[in-house]
Design a protein with these regions (language model features):
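Loop/turn-rich, solvent-exposed surfaces of beta-rich toroidal or solenoidal domains
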Residues: 295, 351, 532-553, 557-563, ...
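Mature N-terminal segment immediately following signal peptide/propeptide cleavage
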Residues: 28-75, 94, 545-547
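Repeat-blade elements of multi-bladed beta-propeller folds
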Residues: 36-40, 84-107, 132-165, 202-228, ...
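Beta-propeller blade signature
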Residues: 169, 174, 232-246, 310-325, ...
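Bacterial signal peptide processing site
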Residues: 22-24
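Phosphate/diphosphate-binding loops
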Residues: 346-395, 651-654
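Extracytoplasmic beta-rich repeat domains
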Residues: 68-91, 121-149, 182-209, 251-281, ...
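C-terminal motif of bacterial Sec signal peptides marking the signal peptidase cleavage site
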Residues: 17-20
Length: 656
């Protein structure tokens, strides 16, 4: 599960951001526009719209076309503490003139795409949030070609919930599809090896939409971090879209001795280690009957002595046969993860021009700030990947990987080197000096510095680099657009007998602690901030970049977001993702200053911005109804990022 820790960012948002109002390339033909039928625009998650009504020349004229309010501000959760965890990360999908999306409480809403008027609403009745922020990124659509257009549940909306259910709803009415699972509700809690046996499954839920391919609805999961080595299993499962019966399941950690990967694990670890789940959105290549899985870190996150080896297939990009669940190929992006460097983004399935030939590819953006690119049929890297030596000073009992994979191209989009005293930054000489003193005190050997008993600077931090917003890809100009963060974390391992004392000590106020049961060490971490709540390293702390994927070169990179009374374009922490359009624009919100922006895709110049009524920690989408192009964003804030909360879905369009 991704984590933007609330420890420190509340101070950061209150001090750092006080928001005011605010050619000559080989071309690949773009697919015909079908609106926005998938979370990522299409099954491959390219976040590209072929619509071009809105252009760099007229984008400044965009106005609010309609606003819808969900009414969900955590009222379904008991107590104000739970409400503060609400996020609104949804991206609507379009089908038959209707937008479908989930709220932060995983209620499902359908609105008229032209007017924003409510068509129907289904209340999921989630009564409790058990860990992390309440996040729900959206829904999936399936149209049953064996039924007529007017039949009940001819088109189905699949919506995951925060209490591990999968709902199948009639797209026309919002009623449960009675022939799916248990009268329209599928219980996802089976065969997961829950670590808590008290009757409530507190650390397993689904935050991203499933993907539907070949009549199967494929579902990942989100699992709580830093708790216990014997955590819930990260099994990916496919269910029949019509009746909800299990078709196949695939566990990224090999449990069966006959699995070729089993020999890379000890018997004890293969039996007990959990996680390596797929909490980001999944992607599909229906023509090749493939589903692409981004797997995350195994348990426990910051100590791996109980799981020696590379730990495949954790921290990997995986291609499975969509009909059988059999592994087609996999590539591990982090060996023996000790940094919570989940494979965090939806794999983007694109067609690249490489050495003059069109190649079916998959691009994976990572928390490390690197883009990995593979032939999606074979798994072979399109740009070479080399294994480089990494620091080897682990704690007693740890078994480190001697090397880690680095793509030759594109170059990293974020800082990866050691944090040095000269990197200290502050808004005053006083806090800059405090940061410089901390840097001298802490360990920092660059990316993949192993966690230790002495406080260590993790750069990039566990929030990225890139995050779940993934990339947006312009197929005509071969440009991948991605937002990133330069936001180091600091952390340390804690001997078990000292954990409680540190948790209770005022010296560590503001730190996040994890027990990491079943290992010799607990952990603590937080964002590396000055006493004033400002990042201790030089800006930009948030950036937007375009990468030419034909050459692997960075075309442009600009700060993303304003800070300190909106006078400094420093680039700020951000959660969300971009989209690109055939009109030559990039749209993105995501930032802590609550603005949505449009950029020229060729230059990175900002052309338009609008101050949202709440944080826009979501990914926009675009579609057309009645010859009018709309851009839609959810604005509801993010609990961990500390942005303003709300319940808005806002559509922008040019004046009629």
């Amino acid at each position: 599960m991704y984590t933007i820790s609330r420890y420190g960012l509340m101070a950061l948002v209150s001090i750092l951001v006080l928001a005011g109002c605010g050619g000559g390339k080989t071309s690949v033909a773009a697919a015909p526009d079908t609106g926005w039928a998938y979370y990522g625009g299409d099954a491959g998650g390219t976040r590209y719209s072929t619509l071009s009504q809105i252009t760099p020349e007229n984008v400044r004229n965009l106005k609010v076309a309609w606003t819808f309010r969900t009414g969900d501000l955590g009222a379904g959760f008991p107590g104000d503490e739970w409400k503060s965890h609400m996020t609104f990360e949804t991206t609507p999908i379009l089908y038959d003139g209707t937008l479908y999306f989930t709220t932060g409480e995983t209620n499902v809403v359908a609105v008229n795409a032209a007017t924003g008027k409510l068509r129907w609403r289904y209340d999921a009745n989630v009564k409790k949030l058990w860990y992390s922020d309440a996040a729900s990124r959206g829904v999936a659509l399936w149209v049953d070609d064996q039924t007529s257009a007017g039949a009940s549940c001819h088109a189905r909306i699949f919506a995951p919930t925060l209490d591990h259910r999968l709902l199948a709803l009639d797209a026309a009415t919002g009623r449960l599809c009675q022939d799916f699972a248990d009268h329209g509700v599928l219980d996802l809690s089976q065969n997961i090896n829950f670590s808590y046996k008290g009757g409530e499954y507190i650390n397993y839920l689904v935050t991203s939409p499933p993907v539907v391919v070949d009549g199967n609805v494929v579902v990942g999961s989100s699992i709580g971090d830093n708790r216990i080595a014997d955590s819930e299993r990260g099994t990916v499962r496919a269910f029949d879209s019509r009746n909800g019966k299990l078709v196949w399941s695939w566990d990224p950690i090999p449990r069966d001795p006959s699995n070729p990967m089993y020999k890379e694990w000890t018997h004890a670890a293969a039996k007990t280690v959990g996680g390596a789940n797929a909490w980001p959105p999944l992607s599909a290549d229906p023509a090749r009957h493939l589903v692409f899985i981004p797997t995350t870190s195994p348990s426990d996150d910051y100590f791996g002595g109980e799981r020696p080896g590379d730990n495949r297939w954790a921290d990997s990009v995986i291609a499975l046969n969509a009909d059988t669940g059999q592994l087609v190929w996999g590539y591990q992006l982090v060996h023996h993860d000790l940094w919570d460097y989940d494979t965090v983004a939806q794999p983007a399935l694109v067609d690249l021009i490489h050495d003059g030939q069109q190649v079916p590819a998959v691009i994976e953006a990572t928390k490390t700030g690197m883009l990995f690119t593979f032939n999606r049929k074979t798994g072979q890297p399109i740009f070479p990947i080399v294994e480089k030596p990494v620091p080897q000073d682990g704690v007693p009992g740890e078994v480190l990987s001697k090397t880690q994979p680095f793509p030759v191209l594109p170059k990293p989009l974020v800082r990866q080197g050691p944090v040095m005293p000269e990197d200290a930054w502050g808004v005053t000489f006083w806090d800059e000096g405090k940061c410089r003193a901390l840097i001298k005190q802490y360990r920092s050997e660059g990316i993949f510095t192993s966690p230790g008993l002495k406080t260590t600077i993790e750069q990039p931090g566990n929030a990225g680099g890139a995050e779940w917003g993934s990339i947006a890809f312009d197929p005509v100009h071969q440009l991948a657009v991605v937002n990133t963060m330069n936001l180091p974390f600091v952390g340390a391992l804690i001997p078990r007998d000292q954990l409680m004392a540190q948790e209770m000590s005022k010296e560590y106020d503001g730190w996040e602690f994890g027990r990491q049961g079943g290992t010799p060490y607990g952990m603590r971490r937080k964002i590396f901030l000055s006493p004033l709540g400002i990042p201790c390293v030089k800006p930009p702390w948030g950036q937007l970049a375009a990468v030419d994927m034909e050459t692997g070169q960075i075309k442009w990179q600009v700060p993303l977001g304003n800070a300190v009374l909106n006078h400094w374009n420093l680039g700020v922490p951000n959660i969300g993702g971009p989209i690109v359009t055939a009109g030559g624009l990039v749209f993105i919100a995501a930032t802590m200053d609550d603005d949505i922006r449009a950029f020229d895709i060729h230059t990175g110049k900002m052309l338009w911005q609008y101050h949202l009524p709440a944080g826009g920690q979501a990914t926009p989408m675009s579609y057309s109804v009645g010859d009018r192009q709309y851009v839609v964003i959810a604005a509801g804030g993010h609990g961990g990022l500390g942005t303003k909360r709300g319940d808005y879905v806002i559509a922008f369009a040019l004046p009629e």
